[in-house]
Amino acid sequence: VKRPMNAFMVWSQNERRKIMDQWPDMHNAEISKSLGRSSQLLQDSEKIPFVKEAGRLRLKHMADYPNYKYRP
């Protein structure tokens, strides 16, 4: 069972698609670095919808898998 996405992953999922559409030959490592830099520039107010969605996903995950324990 996968862990629920955190706020960064929720945000980066859509942003990654945008970057891949613009630069289809860009390597995944470069895309990840770009996403990391971009996320640091976001204002707290811009992060709110992604934090809320991550919280919703976490609650859904807890309901779907009540006995789930993360074991790396």
Swiss-Prot record:
Q: GO annotations under biological process?
A: brain development; camera-type eye morphogenesis; negative regulation of transcription by RNA polymerase II; neuron differentiation
Q: Per its UniProt record, what Pfam families does this chain match?
A: HMG_box (PF00505)
Gene3D superfamilies in alphabetical order: High mobility group box domain
Record's GO cellular component terms: nucleus
Q: Which UniProt keywords apply?
A: DNA-binding, Nucleus
Record localization: Nucleus
Q: Which InterPro entries match?
A: HMG_box_dom (IPR009071), HMG_box_dom_sf (IPR036910), SRY-related_HMG-box_TF-like (IPR050140)
The protein's name: SRY-related protein MG44
**Organism for this UniProt entry:** Tarentola mauritanica (Common wall gecko)
